[in-house]
Amino acid sequence: YNWWNECLHGVARAGIATVYPQAIGLAATFDDDALLRAASIISDEARAKHHQFVREGQRGIYQGLTYWSPNINIFRDPRWGRGQETYGEDPYLTSRMGLAFVRGLQGDDPNYLKLVATAKHFAVHSGPEYDRHHFNATPSRYDLADTYLPAFQTLVQQGSVASVMCAYNRLDGEPCCGSDALQVEILRDRWGFKGYIVSDCGAIDDFYKYHKTYADAKSASVKAVRAGTDLECGGSYESLKEAVRDGKITEEDLNVSLRRLFLARMKLGLFLPEGENPYTAIPYSVVDCEQHRKDALEMARKSIVLLKNENNLLPLSKKLRKIAVIGPAATDSVSLLGNYNGTPGKLTTFLEGIRRKVSSDVEVVYEKGVNLTDDNMFYPVDIWQLLQSKGSKGVHADYFNLSLIHI
């Protein structure tokens, strides 16, 4: 169990939830007060869901209180297909929006955390995606300090973010999750970070599989723990038991991480008697409630940026009697949700929205025009709902490797 939950723009992979615009859209609002409110709503739903899961005896992945959001990497490289998860290319805007998001997630109780927020991915993790497991980032000292680190520093020193996720890539030859320069000298010693560090999934494996900086899981794990990576998403830390027996690391070294992890659980109120946790009173009825939907709609409206309005086409004239909607995105509900998303109780496509908005005497015609991905068929399935430990059958998949010839 690696404490994995997601809420990049709404509680994700845990059933019905209020879905906000993707992070890049939230940044386009330039409204950190509104984002603080949105994050507070998200954390309300996360708390309500967690306590309902506990009542049902469920404590699996995506059912906890430690959330791997926000993503405060800098969207500098357009080849990074996951740039929409970030707040864009500007370090200052990213700092402001990330700070608001963390404050909304973690709450304002002086003694307890509403959720654990996680600032990720530390550091210089900005695509391309395909080589992230072996890439060596070599920014100048100025670029590192001026571009890639400010948002993390803000979230640590002003937001008291409870967790940081270390990145897959290397920085100046050292895997980030084993970097003394990043995690000890900068994060803990210089900035005063008191929380815990969690690895990205499989990042410790990368030390010896792809970076080739360490020989095996044991040596990689020892290095990661000593550099302050307290929790691993993956399996390499299983080797730490053998490392202790071999004298490569001590139990007290492990206890340093253990204490940080238990402190996070205590701050979440997980050891309090029933009724004493200030956040257990949040009712499940808040999940995807009407007020939350209205707030998400308002954020979506604020996120829209008009780049061009040729011949003052917008707003549309009420004299129009026929509107043509062209393109596959008009009816694609999946693309509306982004990634790391929840499942809304109600979803309206662009075409449906236009047809509902116009008067009955306006004809709306639709033409798909082209496919989004050539002629591939894509059938969306919420697979995360099938990956729960409920004793039921899982997913059956057949894999085909065929050479297709166009005739």
Report each predicted region and the residues it spans.
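Glycoside hydrolase catalytic-domain context in secreted enzymes
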Residues: 1-403
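Conserved small/polar residues in nucleotide/adenosyl-binding loops
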Residues: 405-407
